[in-house]
């Protein structure tokens, strides 16, 4: 029972992250949101680094490079994308990450792609076409978030070799701290621009503590209790949370195009990640 509570909280934290970002980009720059988010999260991740297993010096450059993609590139482009598209659509596009992991693994790690997975990939990208309304802002926003999706896939694909040496929490904590180094120079101006808006401050704190720190801890706790291939299916609930939260909290419209396109994306991803 405990693992399902943890999963429900994790999915909720990650789903609401897109809503918090969409609210925050009304007042802060995309880089400011990312720098503030990780200033908070890294304070907690630093404790894990201090208490946990040390990353070997020879592995630090790879962890740093992975972190650049998984933190700086991923979050800045996601925040940029949400300037132009709704939080719900952003979460649907991000959910394509397993498909890019599959493609990158096939290219660089020589992992096999089955016929059913090819069908899933086609269905998922058809879904993206459906939700891509014919406007410059919408297409541009989706393209920006797609960069984040590819960055997340790079982080996951090329981080596989390090998971044989380090546990996921240790690796993630170091990648978060090292990967956000390019964001640190923007922190002083970001703090000044934050002001005294309690709703905005609450959104940033939520992103740093709950969506980032507790989100990852919860996910890895669940992975210890559940098979990874089955666990990944539950991540399909994240866009559902984001779409509903965006509609309820930010009055984002749930159009037929959005619902139909999202449904196709999630169906395609399910076909890709399900265990045969």
Curated annotation (Swiss-Prot):
It comes from the Archaea. GO terms for cellular component: plasma membrane. Keywords: Cell membrane, Membrane, Repeat, Transmembrane, Transmembrane helix, Transport. It is found in: Cell membrane. Its main location: membrane. It holds the Pfam family EamA. The chain crosses the membrane at residues 5-25, 31-51, 63-83, 89-109, 119-139, 142-162, 168-188, 200-220, 231-251, 253-273. It is a multi-pass membrane protein. Residues 12-133, 150-274 form the EamA domain. InterPro entries: Alkyne_AA_exporter, EamA_dom. Belongs to the EamA transporter family. PANTHER family: EAMA DOMAIN-CONTAINING PROTEIN (PTHR12715:SF4), TRANSPORTER, DRUG/METABOLITE EXPORTER FAMILY (PTHR12715). This is Uncharacterized transporter AF_0266. It comes from Archaeoglobus fulgidus (strain ATCC 49558 / DSM 4304 / JCM 9628 / NBRC 100126 / VC-16). The lineage of its organism: Archaea, Methanobacteriati, Methanobacteriota, Archaeoglobi, Archaeoglobales.
């Amino acid at each position: 029972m405990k693992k399902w509570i943890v999963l429900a909280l994790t999915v909720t934290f990650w789903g609401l992250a897109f809503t918090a970002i969409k609210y925050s980009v009304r007042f802060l720059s995309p880089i400011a949101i990312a720098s503030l988010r990780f200033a908070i999260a890294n304070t907690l991740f630093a404790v894990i680094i201090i208490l946990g297993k040390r990353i070997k010096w020879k592995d630090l450059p790879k962890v740093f490079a992975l972190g650049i993609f998984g933190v700086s590139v991923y979050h800045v482009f996601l925040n940029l994308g949400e300037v132009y598209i709704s939080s719900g659509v952003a979460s649907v596009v991000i959910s394509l990450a397993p498909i890019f992991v599959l493609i990158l693994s096939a290219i660089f790690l020589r992992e096999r792609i089955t016929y059913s997975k090819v069908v899933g990939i086609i269905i998922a990208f058809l879904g993206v076409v459906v939700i891509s309304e014919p406007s410059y802002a919408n297409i541009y926003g989706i393209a920006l978030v797609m960069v984040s999706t590819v960055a997340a896939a790079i982080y996951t694909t090329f981080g596989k070799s390090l998971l044989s040496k380090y546990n996921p929490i240790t690796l993630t904590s170091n990648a978060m701290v090292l990967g956000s180094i390019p964001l640190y120079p923007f922190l002083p101006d970001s703090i000044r621009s934050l002001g005294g808006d309690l709703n905005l401050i609450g959104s940033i704190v939520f992103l740093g503590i709950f969506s980032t720190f507790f989100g990852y801890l919860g996910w890895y706790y669940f992975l210890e209790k559940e098979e990874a291939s089955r666990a990944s299916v539950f991540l399909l609930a994240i866009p559902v949370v984001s779409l509903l939260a965006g509609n309820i909290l930010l009055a984002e419209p749930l159009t037929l195009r959005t619902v139909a396109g999202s449904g196709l994306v999630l169906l395609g991803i399910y076909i890709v990640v399900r265990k045969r």
